[in-house]
């Protein structure tokens, strides 16, 4: 999962908050209008509470845009003076943000949108997802696959998140960059951007659809008519100027720094004092609920009589008191020791070897474990006590020191505790140390207890221990002033580092006592904990990528794109802009008349989305070519051109990271990069898999893929005998289903009938409806309903199973996999039918998908252990849900194939046999 950065446009939210209360302004007892402050803070806390961002900052205008004013002296000249209440609010908002430890980004001579635009692009380049929090539509020009507009809720409406699709629909453009042309054409009265005379929103959309850009419009005014042509020809310079003024700058001298923008704990006392001064009682409660979910707020005192004092304004705005103050290092007794001498280190090692369970945590130089160097290691085996072992900078000396502690780390009798242990294991592997012994990872344990909550240590500490850990920023600072941990005084590093191990140790005690209560102990011990080492090994191994092949394939796709464009133009009888929905719609629906009743957008333009065009692809080759053109464009940019950038310079391989604590069903997720979504459905997409190759000519790739595992699981769990019998006879389950549903002999089932049966078979897991089936096939809705009814009549136990699962979820609030993994479903009792329906579908799907995830994890652990036990050179490289990919020496192939097949097919015993299909090739495509 990518990290997420939220950037707030301060003034846009402040003005919005101020005017939201314009009819009922918030005035405190001192006569101060606090509407702007309150509105802004509500928006900020809503984002933090709802989205739980990893990184966040607030951008302010400072002195206006010098560049735009130099370009156009009257830029924003007609804006009214800022209301006094807003001017007075700004210092308070600055003060609150500083107390919250939220970065304030401003630059003299630049506007907030330029700052946010620059930071967004920088963060996107660092593999972040960026959310621009603002109601200002101008930001739509910045939207991309990883940059989104986040429009806060207003007037009872929910928040809106605009991605590429939403921008395309709302502005009727092909590319978000065309929003600049749209804004330039129609102008902006608020900012005094002139635009083109006589061009409003509707006309701007039409012109953009016809011409694609401001420049193309101005170069082809001869195609316009009447007054519009005259207006535009006489104001071409205004058009160019307006587009320049509307363009958000991307070169502001600001820098996105990961550490500087990271969310951290606020100064609760400072925030409380400011809110007390402003008389923000309710906002304080909101603040505490956002940052301290376990805090208890005490109501203000009542008058002696038990009645509220009529004349006491203090009761309305009184500062609530925290009954349970947060603990921290300064108010909690602790004893942390430094082991920085040979004698201290020897004594520490002796103590470690006497323990049965120890928590440890590494301090390093890099978040990428493959490139990280040790700065120090902290140890704890009793609450509020611990040790810090600092490491020298020189690799040789550091290796010598870690060698001294190898007997502890590789002692199988001593259990190791940590938070995100996989990272620590990989760091120690850099020094040749293989951690042994049972593993207890608090992050994974908490995921099993509460999969929908965040699992980082600071949040867990605040929630379960009522303790605020030392912020890393207090040691090394943020942004440009950030220093290396090696330069921090050793006593300060000791306090910070050992506290991490201490907190993790205490969390272990909390979670260890809770896990048996929710049936989580066994699945942790037998599955998730052993999997840590398996995933660490896979991540460290990486996979070989044929970069040269992808570069050549990129050229092939360029040629395909050009060929498709030529073919489309020939079929249309003219050249036109494929990126223009207006021109495309006119060609398809007016000139070629592919539909007698074409759908239109709200503005009257022809709809040309994939959903609209897909039904015409079979009958009209031009439509098929257009859809293919779009697919090729996306394939090239998302995979073919992007994957080579992910190759590690030191290893020459691509290293993904597998996350155990993301998907609620228990599935693994892959990121940086995501190797679980490599295309497979189309011939062109399949070529991307061809780029994943064996280590060298002496190796091959082995793919092992479970055959229809989810259908086998649902057949077994539902005890549906007809389906079980088909699997036992090793029949093609989709052909068998078609024979039963359509009442024809097995050998007479048509390809179309099998296809419909396959759609229903897989759709049943996700609660397919007649409407959904109709959309996926050529069946009418009534035919789809009849097919589903016949399906359930053929497999009656499936319907019973689905009903039982939903009833179980209603009664218990969760469902379980075959290993007891729970998926909690709080929305199962929702009064909203749509929300409740989603929970009901999850009640059916989660045990099936989760059980499949459990089974392949069992297989992965067994295979990993057997490869090690037999000292084979084969390595497991990838897990893509139901498929495993291995790098196998050709000399080991006949040993490994039966080993893998047996481990996968015997991972779990069901009423239906598990089947793993194996394939071998020099690349992933050939092996699959």
Positions of predicted regions on the chain:
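Conserved catalytic core of nucleic-acid polymerases
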Residues: 483-486, 490, 533, 540, ...
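C-terminal polymerase-core module
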Residues: 559-566, 570-624, 793-845, 891-928
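Conserved RNase H-like, two-metal-ion catalytic cores of nucleic-acid enzymes
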Residues: 6, 16-51, 55-57, 73-74, ...
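Extended two-metal-dependent nuclease catalytic cores across DNA- and RNA-processing enzymes
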Residues: 2-3, 23-27, 77-253, 462-464
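Extended, highly charged clamp/arch subdomains and adjacent linkers
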Residues: 1-60, 64-76, 88-95, 236, ...
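Conserved "right-hand" nucleotidyltransferase catalytic core of DNA-directed polymerases
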Residues: 235-392, 410, 419, 452, ...
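Short hydrophobic beta-strand that contains or immediately precedes a catalytic carboxylate
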Residues: 7-8, 134, 358-360, 439-440, ...
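Short alpha-helix plus adjacent loop in nuclease-associated cores
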Residues: 74-88, 144-173, 229-230, 387-405, ...
């Amino acid at each position: 999962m990518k990290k997420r950065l939220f950037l707030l446009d301060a003034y846009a939210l402040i003005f919005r908050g101020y005017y939201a209360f314009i009819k009922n302004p918030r005035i405190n007892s001192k006569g101060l209008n606090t509407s702007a402050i309150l509105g802004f803070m509500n928006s900020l806390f809503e984002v933090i509470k709802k989205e739980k961002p990893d990184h966040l900052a607030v951008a302010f205008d400072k002195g206006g845009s010098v560049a735009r004013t130099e370009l156009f002296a009257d830029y924003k000249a007609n804006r009214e003076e800022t209301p006094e209440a807003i001017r007075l609010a700004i210092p308070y908002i600055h003060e609150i943000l500083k107390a919250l430890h939220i970065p304030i980004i401003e630059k003299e001579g630049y506007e907030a949108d330029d700052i946010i635009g620059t930071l967004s692009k920088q963060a996107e380049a660092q593999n972040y997802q960026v959310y621009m929090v603002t109601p200002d539509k101008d930001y739509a020009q910045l939207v991309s696959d990883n940059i989104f507009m986040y429009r806060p809720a207003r007037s009872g409406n929910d928040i809106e998140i605009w991605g590429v699709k939403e921008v395309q629909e709302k502005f009727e453009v092909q590319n978000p960059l065309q929003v600049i042309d749209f804004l330039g054409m129609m102008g902006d009265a608020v900012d005094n951007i002139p635009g083109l005379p006589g061009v409003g929103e509707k006309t701007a959309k039409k012109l953009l659809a016809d011409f694609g850009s401001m420049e193309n419009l101005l170069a082809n005014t001869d195609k316009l008519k009447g007054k519009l042509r005259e207006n535009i020809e006489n104001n071409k310079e205004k058009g160019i100027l307006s587009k320049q003024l509307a363009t958000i700058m991307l070169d502001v001298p600001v820098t996105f720094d990961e550490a500087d923008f990271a969310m951290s704990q606020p100064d609760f006392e400072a925030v409380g004092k400011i809110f007390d001064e402003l008389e923000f009682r309710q906002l304080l409660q909101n603040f505490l609920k956002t940052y301290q979910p376990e805090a208890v707020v005490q109501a203000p005192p009542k008058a002696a009589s038990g009645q509220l004092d009529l004349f006491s304004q203090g009761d309305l705005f009184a500062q609530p008191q925290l009954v349970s103050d947060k603990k921290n290092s300064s108010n909690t007794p602790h004893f942390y020791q430094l082991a920085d001498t040979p004698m201290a280190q020897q004594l520490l090692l002796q103590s470690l070897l006497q323990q049965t369970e120890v928590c440890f945590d590494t301090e390093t130089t890099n978040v990428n474990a493959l490139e990280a160097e040790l700065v120090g290691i902290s140890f704890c085996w009793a609450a509020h006590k611990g040790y810090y072992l600092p490491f020298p900078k020189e690799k040789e000396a550091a290796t010598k020191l870690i060698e001294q502690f190898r007997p502890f780390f590789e002692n199988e009798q001593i259990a190791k505790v940590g938070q995100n242990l996989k990272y620590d294991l990989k760091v120690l592997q850099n020094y040749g140390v293989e951690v042994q012994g049972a593993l207890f990872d608090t992050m994974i344990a908490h995921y099993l207890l509460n999969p929908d909550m965040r699992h980082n240590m600071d949040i867990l500490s605040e929630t379960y221990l009522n303790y605020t850990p030392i912020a890393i920023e207090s040691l090394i600072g943020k942004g440009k002033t950030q220093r290396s941990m090696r330069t921090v005084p050793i006593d300060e590093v000791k306090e910070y580092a050992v506290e991490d191990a201490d907190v993790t140790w205490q969390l272990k005690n909390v979670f260890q006592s809770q896990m048996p209560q929710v049936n989580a102990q066994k699945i942790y011990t037998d599955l998730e904990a052993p999997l840590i080492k398996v995933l660490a090994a896979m991540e460290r191994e990486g996979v070989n990528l044929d970069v040269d092949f992808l570069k050549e394939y990129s050229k092939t796709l360029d040629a395909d794109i050009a060929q498709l464009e030529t073919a489309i133009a020939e079929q249309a009888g003219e050249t036109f802009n494929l990126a223009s929905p207006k021109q495309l719609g006119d060609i398809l629906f007016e000139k070629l008349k592919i539909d007698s009743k074409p759908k239109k957008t709200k503005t009257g333009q022809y709809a040309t989305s994939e959903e609209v065009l897909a039904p015409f692809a079979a009958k009209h080759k031009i439509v098929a070519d257009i859809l293919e053109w779009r697919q090729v464009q996306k394939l090239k940019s998302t995979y073919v051109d992007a994957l080579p950038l992910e190759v590690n310079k030191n290893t020459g391989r691509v290293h993904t990271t597998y996350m155990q604590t993301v998907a609620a069903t228990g599935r693994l997720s892959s990121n940086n990069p995501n190797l679980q979504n490599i295309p497979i459905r189309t011939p062109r997409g399949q070529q991307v898999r061809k780029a994943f190759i064996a280590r060298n000519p002496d190796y091959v790739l082995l793919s092992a893929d479970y055959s229809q595992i989810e259908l086998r699981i649902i057949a077994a769990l539902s005890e549906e005998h007809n389906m079980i019998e088909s699997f036992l006879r090793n029949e093609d389950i989709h052909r068998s289903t078609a024979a039963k549903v359509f009442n024809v002999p097995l050998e007479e089932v048509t390809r179309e009938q099998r296809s419909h049966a396959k759609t229903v078979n897989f759709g049943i897991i996700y609660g397919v409806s007649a409407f959904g089936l109709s959309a996926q096939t050529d069946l009418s809705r009534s035919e789809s309903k009849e097919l589903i009814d016949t399906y359930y009549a053929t497999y009656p136990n499936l319907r019973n199973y689905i009903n039982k699962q939903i009833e179980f979820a209603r009664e218990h609030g969760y469902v379980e996999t075959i290993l007891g993994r729970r998926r909690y479903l709080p929305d199962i009792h929702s009064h909203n039918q749509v929300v409740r329906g989603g929970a009901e579908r999850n009640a059916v799907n989660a045990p099936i998908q989760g059980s499949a995830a459990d089974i392949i994890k069992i297989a992965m652990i067994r295979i990993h252990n057997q490869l090690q036990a037999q000292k084979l050179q084969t390595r497991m490289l990838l897990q893509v849900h139901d498929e495993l990919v291995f790098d196998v020496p050709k000399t080991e192939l006949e040993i490994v194939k039966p080993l893998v097949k047996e481990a996968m097919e015997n991972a779990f015993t069901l009423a239906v046999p598990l089947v793993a299909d194996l394939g071998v090739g020099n690349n992933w495509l050939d092996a699959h």
